[in-house]
Amino acid sequence: MILFSGDLRVALVTIHVPVSKVAEQLTTEAIVEKIKQFDASLNKDFNIVKPRIAVLSLNPHSGDNGLIGNEEKEIIIPAIEEARAQKIHAFGPYAADGFFGSGNYKKFDGVLAMYHDQGLAPFKALAGTGGVNFTAGLPIVRTSPDHGTGYDIAGQNLADPESMRQAIYAAIDIHRNRRLWAERTANPLRRQYVDKSKDNVVLDLTKDK
């Protein structure tokens, strides 16, 4: 699940789980996988080549060197390092309050939060009524408003259509971006070089390797 509005894009490691169970569901492997999925979606669905991803911490002050929790040192930092080893531009972990409060989120193409309210509370405060919910990783494009059904105001002419309108526009944009991505990656350039070797090596440009 990715929530986005303009250049602000927020994804989650855990989604609809109780806060009391968030820590036990965080593993290095799970975070690495979410970073990879987020990176792929930013590239394919949002047409951002080599996106910069900020990873939030779980504990206040990023754990304060273990004084307020060890998840950063034992789980999150190793996940970021593994993602970077796979040539993904992942950075952090950042304490959520200072990260959003200082405006640092503007320096990144995407923000990965550890749990639901950590990411969505600041997102909705910043995005206002125009946020969009996007489900990444599906073969189809799926978007929706970033709010609930609102049965309590149904039929009263009180609903704000902006999020629904933006969800429709976003679906069109993502479909277009996927088509561009497919065209861009369909026929990559062949190698135009050879590894350092003997002087009599003959370069054959008809081969990929």
For each predicted feature, which ranges?
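Anion-binding alpha/beta catalytic cores of soluble intermediary-metabolism enzymes, centered on
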Residues: 1-71, 77-209
